[in-house]
């Protein structure tokens, strides 16, 4: 299925489909007029004698140097090659596809001045699976994501490297195998390709999508734990949360109520329960997870605006004037990435605390130590809980805001930068850790619920338990647990446990 992009109106669900499903995208044909008009305006300037930044001048600190019309094409080529300075391992294919899609959206607004054939080459690369090799490091998030986007642009010129049919090869070889021809960049086109926030935004969107999946997985795991610990569901009463008024808290409480509804375990201890209140990691799930959801919603609002934005420089305005500005500065993306990082950290933190409760016989309300059968001879989930603690601690360190850092670059011309790119990139590592933490909690909670037999959990949670046990057996004695943790990670990270239930049970990630 091909996603047709209408720049300015692209939705979060369309971008999710690109990231999770590898959907191919192209611009709506209505964009062609604006693209052609912008290209004509730039061509006219390039043919004239008046110096205009980015069209017939140098770049950055060298902006005052006028470039002759005969060298404009050389200027663009040199720009791309000199900026291919990325280092580190290549970004994943779905990240690069998302980057390329975001660049299409930006160019499709017609304010960048590139030719239609350049845009169509980018579309054809996506359609034919030519995926540029883009090293993950090298951008400070202003003046745009220069280095990573230069690696993308290099392939369009027949330079650099690309993956084609999962094989890494030269950029020109990948184009040829796909039946495509490299393009010679004309005035401003190189700058339009690399001046933008598309790498940072793609990484932040990936973090958002993964964070939302983790949040839903955390709600499911938290509901399982609540039943495993015979916790009270009274704190999920909707009126409590309506009185406070936070949207995330309200919808999270509704989700938790749905998940534990009709639980036989809960019904068995509605009366004569000597515990007045549960620990906060059980009782305050709506408050904590709701606040995390609100952070994700806020980040989503920022990122969908940025995804539809024109972020290169200079720009062609509606009156045909060409004006230099600073839309390439990724501060909004950096802030959004920091918000997502805080949410990922807290989702993992409260999950780890629930694991700790379940493995401790002093506070687990009758569960055996470490959920082990014949504890002592068997260690059960003792070290799985330690692993969760280690991952939680890693995430705490990575949650420190990246946006508070800045360092001058480019001979002090670019003297304040956003650090959005690595601020967004760390979300991938944080979410990987978080998927494992939630996977561990799910395993421990499922074991705990089984210890409550013959009492049964809710019908919704029972369906999740049945799916889980088709993939991972109950821990009846110590075994090689790494395999279980790996399988649990996959079930959470790929959303397989969530797919057992209707998606309407969970809060919907829709920016307000």
From Swiss-Prot:
InterPro entries: Aromatic_Lyase (IPR001106), Fumarase/histidase_N (IPR024083), HutH (IPR005921), L-Aspartase-like (IPR008948), Phe/His_NH3-lyase_AS (IPR022313). PROSITE patterns: PAL_HISTIDASE (PS00488). Keywords: Cytoplasm, Histidine metabolism, Lyase. It comes from the Bacteria. GO terms for cellular component: cytoplasm. It holds the Pfam family Lyase_aromatic. It is an enzyme of class 4 (lyase). GO terms for molecular function: histidine ammonia-lyase activity. Its EC number is 4.3.1.3. Transmembrane segments: none annotated. It is found in: Cytoplasm. Contains an active site 4-methylidene-imidazol-5-one (MIO), which is formed autocatalytically by cyclization and dehydration of residues Ala-Ser-Gly. The modification 2,3-didehydroalanine (Ser) is found at residue 143. Gene3D superfamilies: Fumarase/aspartase (Central domain) (1.20.200.10), Fumarase/aspartase (N-terminal domain) (1.10.275.10). There is a cross-link at residues 142-144 (5-imidazolinone (Ala-Gly)). It catalyses: L-histidine = trans-urocanate + NH4(+). Pathway: Amino-acid degradation; L-histidine degradation into L-glutamate; N-formimidoyl-L-glutamate from L-histidine: step 1/3. Signal peptide: none annotated. GO terms for biological process: L-histidine catabolic process to glutamate and formamide; L-histidine catabolic process to glutamate and formate. Belongs to the PAL/histidase family. This is Histidine ammonia-lyase. It comes from Bartonella henselae (strain ATCC 49882 / DSM 28221 / CCUG 30454 / Houston 1) (Rochalimaea henselae).
């Amino acid at each position: 299925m091909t996603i047709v992009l209408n720049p300015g109106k692209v939705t979060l669900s369309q971008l999710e489909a690109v990231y999770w499903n590898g959907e191919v995208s192209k611009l709506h044909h209505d964009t062609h007029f604006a693209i052609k008009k912008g290209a004509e305006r730039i061509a006219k300037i390039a043919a004239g004698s008046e110096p205009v930044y980015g069209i017939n001048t140098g770049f950055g600190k060298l902006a005052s140097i006028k470039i002759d019309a005969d060298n404009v094409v050389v200027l663009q080529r040199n720009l791309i090659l000199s900026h291919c300075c990325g280092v580190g391992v290549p970004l994943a294919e779905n990240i690069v596809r998302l980057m390329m899609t975001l660049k299409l959206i930006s160019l499709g607004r017609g304010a960048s001045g590139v030719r239609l054939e350049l845009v169509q080459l980018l579309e054809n690369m996506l359609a034919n699976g030519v995926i540029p090799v883009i090293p993950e490091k090298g951008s400070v998030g202003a003046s745009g994501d220069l280095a990573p986007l230069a690696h993308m642009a290099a392939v369009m010129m027949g330079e650099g490297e690309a993956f084609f049919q999962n094989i890494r090869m030269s950029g020109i070889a990948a184009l040829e195998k796909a039946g495509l021809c490299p393009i010679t960049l004309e005035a401003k086109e190189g700058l339009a390709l690399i001046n933008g926030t598309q790498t940072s935004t793609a990484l932040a969107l990936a973090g958002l999508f993964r964070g939302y999946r983790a949040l839903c997985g955390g709600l499911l795991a938290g509901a399982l734990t609540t039943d495993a610990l015979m916790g009270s569901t009274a704190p999920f009463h909707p009126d409590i949360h309506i009185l406070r008024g936070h949207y995330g808290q309200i919808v999270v409480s509704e989700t938790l109520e749905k998940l534990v509804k009709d639980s036989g375990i809960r019904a068995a201890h509605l009366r004569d329960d000597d515990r007045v209140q549960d620990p906060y990691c059980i009782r305050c799930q709506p408050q904590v997870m709701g606040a995390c959801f609100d952070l994700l919603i806020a980040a989503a609002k920022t990122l969908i605006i940025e995804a539809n934005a024109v972020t290169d420089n200079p720009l062609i305005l509606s009156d045909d004037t060409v004006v230099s500005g600073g839309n390439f500065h990724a501060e909004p993306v950096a802030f959004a990435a920091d918000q997502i990082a805080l949410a990922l950290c807290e989702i993992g933190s409260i999950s780890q605390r629930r694991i700790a409760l379940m493995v401790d016989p002093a506070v687990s309300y009758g569960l055996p130590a470490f959920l082990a059968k014949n504890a002592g001879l068997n260690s059960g989930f003792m070290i799985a809980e330690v692993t969760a603690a280690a991952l939680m601690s890693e995430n705490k360190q990575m949650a420190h805001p990246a946006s508070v850092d800045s360092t001058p670059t480019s001979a002090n011309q670019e003297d304040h930068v956003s650090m959005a790119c690595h601020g967004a990139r760390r979300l991938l590592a944080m979410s990987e850790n978080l998927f494992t933490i939630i996977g561990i909690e799910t395993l421990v909670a499922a074991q705990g619920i089984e210890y409550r037999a013959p009492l049964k959990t809710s019908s919704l949670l029972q369906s999740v338990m049945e799916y889980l046990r088709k993939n991972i057996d109950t821990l009846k004695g110590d075994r090689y647990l790494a395999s279980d943790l790996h399988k649990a990670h996959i079930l959470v990270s790929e959303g397989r446990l969530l797919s057992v239930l209707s998606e309407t049970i969970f809060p919907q990630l829709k920016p307000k």
